[in-house]
Amino acid sequence: MQTEKNEHKSNRFTRTFFEQDLILSHRIAQQLHKRFYDRIDHSFFVSMKVLRRQHRDTEAQQIETAVQGLCDKMECDLTQASERIVATFAKAQMPSPCGHSDITASYKAEYSTGYSFRLLDLFSRFDRLLMQIEALELHNLGTADECTSLIRFWHGEFHRFLNALTAVRSRPDPHSSSSKETPHDKA
């Protein structure tokens, strides 16, 4: 049973969302998901859906274009890296293994925009890439130092990607009372 306060809060800010199962095996993917995903999903909702409700379509379109570009680039980079690893296994006449971990975690991730759904897919691809890199070392196709270096590189790349998504935000509504300039601001 909801209290009156919670009912008021839920009526003031409602959003439609869906749930997606997300399984991450690598601890780095899990850490980044926990740290960034909910915040970025909320930011996408506010920056796209809420802006459109406020008839700020041009601004929403600019944000969508920026997010689309970032996601396209990361998807391309992850795909190319994964293909190189698969080619390394093929060259060694080995099938590319599907890795598992003793710390595999399953999440019920909520998404409220198509870009959030796409971000969940990118998290899954990132996790798969990290597991493929781990498999290189386990199958003696790369040294421990090489694989550790690759994992650090991709950790940094994906972290920068998530920071870039976080930075793509809407500006306050210029017509709202909270964003009006005060005489003190002009000084």
Where are these regions (language model features)?
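Polar/charged low-complexity regulatory segments
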Residues: 1-131, 135-137, 148, 152-187
